Amino acid sequence: MYSIKVEANFSSAHNLRGYKGRCEDLHGHNWKVELTVQAKELNKIGMVQDFRFLKDKLNAVLDKLDHKHLNELGYFKKVNPTSENIAKYIFDCLAGIKGIKSVTVWESENSCATYHE
């Protein structure tokens, strides 16, 4: 099995509803997002997929989140914008990509959440 990964970044603000602590208040992150795609076999030119294609797809999703207050966006009006839920949201937006394995969202250098099916 082969796996490849692309990374991209976005900045946004959010607050965690129902959380008792500092993250209940409005705050921001410079998020790093990793998209991992896998394949049992390489394509005819020896690749899982084109990195540029994957970066373009990922950036198209992240552009909708960049410099936004996530709680005000449609999906996150009902779903708490935790790292876990952001990872799932991005995964679902990219679900049409052949071989998608996982999306990992880093909210800091030391803390991340991964969604995979």
Q: Where do the language-model regions lie?
A:
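Charge-rich, low-complexity N-terminal segments
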Residues: 1-117
